[in-house]
Structures are given as C-alpha cells and as structure tokens.
Design a protein with these regions (language model features):
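Conserved phosphate-handling catalytic cores of large alpha/beta enzymes
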Residues: 228
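Short Gly/Thr/Asp-enriched flexible loops that form oxyanion-binding sites at enzyme active sites
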Residues: 39-45, 194-212
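Gly/Ser/Thr-enriched, mixed-charge loops and adjacent short helices
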Residues: 40-172, 178
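N-terminal small/polar loop signature for handling phosphorylated ligands or for N-terminal nucleophile
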Residues: 1-39, 142-197
Length: 253
C-alpha cells in the first residue's frame, strides 16, 4: 500500500484535503481530538475527503476482527519502505494548496481587510499554529498575539487538561491574554484543529465565549450580507441546516 505521510504534525482539515488533492483511496489521522491526554483516537476519511460513514466503519472493523494483529499484519522496515517508494513524504506544496483553497472561500470579494483588528490566538498545544497564523497573515491580518504557553505541540496539555475550545476552562489563558492586549477577538483551535472557540468583547469590555450556534448564525449573516452587497447572492437562495453529522448534507443554491 502506497502511503503519503506528513513529515510533521498537521491538522485534521489538511489530512482531509490531502486525501482528495493527492487522489488517495483513504486518509487516516491518529488523534484524540479535543479530549484529555490519556485518550487517543483514529479518524478515517474516504477518497472524497469526508469521514467514513457508520456503515463503512463497521465494515472496516469487521475486517480488522478477522485478523491476528501479530501474525496477519504485514510489516516492513520504515526506512526500507521510504527507499522503495512505498512511503512518500508530503511536500509543503500541499499545505500551500490547502491554505490557498481556504483563502478562496473568502467573501470579501476584493475588499481590504481591517488590518487594525487585534487577534489573540491559541492552538491549545496542538497542530493549528502554522496553518492558522499563516492563513490569517496571508489574508492581511497582522496584529496577532499568540498565547505563548500554548503555541507549541504538547500532548500532555500542561496548561489545559481538557483542550476543548468551546468551554471556558480551556479558554482561560487566552482570555487573560485578550484582556492584557485589549484584543478585539480571541480564537482558539482544539489540538487537531477541526474545532474553534471564539470570544468577543462586549459593550462592557468583557469577553464572551460564543456558542457554536451563535458563531454559525453570525457567519451566515455575514456571508449573506456580503453576497448581497456585491451582487453575488443567487436567485431564490435556500439555507439547509444539518443537525447531526449523520443527516442530509447541507446545501444551498
């Protein structure tokens, strides 16, 4: 089996993207996501870059259970596999392509960003630092302060035992940074960088952590207003909302 391997830690979204970009049959991410350090997990993506369905996961598990993990699993030396081309390191060009795709989703439509926006960002000792800061900076946001204690990857999560950015406890250090820097916005991503926590300053100067529903509606309102402003709104638009990951895919026209 030919394997394309990231040479360093990378977020879940880049694995999903690379699966399609490199025309792979599947993608795999070993991660505990936003859970405490004692846990670990295994995320699998199909050739379309989407997480496999429950049915597909059951089929994979059924095949695994047929095997003796010692006698039936084929193994070879890692360096030999690299030498033979069975393992190939993914180049930085793929990360660049991912970031370009993210930037292409912008609805600024040529408007200049507000470079004065002050942002505090924390990757919560996970994988988000390079792709998130690079994307923000390439979009024009340069006033970014990093939560230094949480900048580098550390699977023990020493400053944040439960690194879920949707809970206040995980955002505590970032909140302190935001207050000290009088930031407009606090962003934090969970360790595998597929979940974001957002806190904004209210009229009293206090920082309020947004729920996922609030963030979703704010984004929806912004997208609609920008498309309307620039005459990019399609005729008879429809918004469909998916309430679980097992329901109908969300589409708009």
């Amino acid at each position: 089996i030919k394997v394309n391997l990231w040479p360093r830690l990378n977020p879940v979204p880049t694995v999903s993207f690379a699966t399609r970009y490199l025309h792979a049959s599947a993608g795999v991410m070993v991660t505990a996501s936003h859970n405490p350090s004692k846990y670990n997990g295994y995320k699998v993506y199909g050739a379309d870059g989407c997480q496999i369905t429950t049915e597909a996961a059951a089929a994979v598990l059924a095949e695994i259970e047929k095997l003796d993990i010692f006698a039936d699993v084929k193994k070879m030396d890692f360096d030999e596999a690299v030498k033979e081309g069975k393992i190939e390191y993914i180049s930085d060009d793929v990360l660049t392509a991912f970031i370009e795709k993210v930037k292409s989703q912008s609805v600024l439509f040529g408007e200049e960003v507000n470079k004065n926006v002050s942002i505090v960002y924390s990757p919560l000792n996970g994988t988000g630092y390079i792709p998130v800061t690079r994307t923000l900076e390439e979009m024009g946001y340069t006033n970014i302060t990093i939560v230094e204690e949480q900048r580098l990857p550390d699977g023990n999560f020493p400053t944040c035992p439960y690194p879920n950015p949707e809970i206040k406890e995980a955002m505590a250090l970032g909140m302190d940074y935001a207050k000290r820097n009088n930031a407009d916005l606090l962003l934090a991503t969970d360790p595998d960088c597929d979940r974001v926590g957002i806190a904004v300053k209210d009229k009293n100067g206090d920082y309020q952590l947004l729920t996922g529903n609030q963030t979703g509606m704010l984004l929806f309102d912004y997208i609609c207003s920008q498309r309307t402003k620039h005459n990019r709104m399609p005729a008879d638009p429809v918004m469909a909302v998916s309430y679980t990951h097992l329901t109908l895919p969300t589409n708009s026209r």
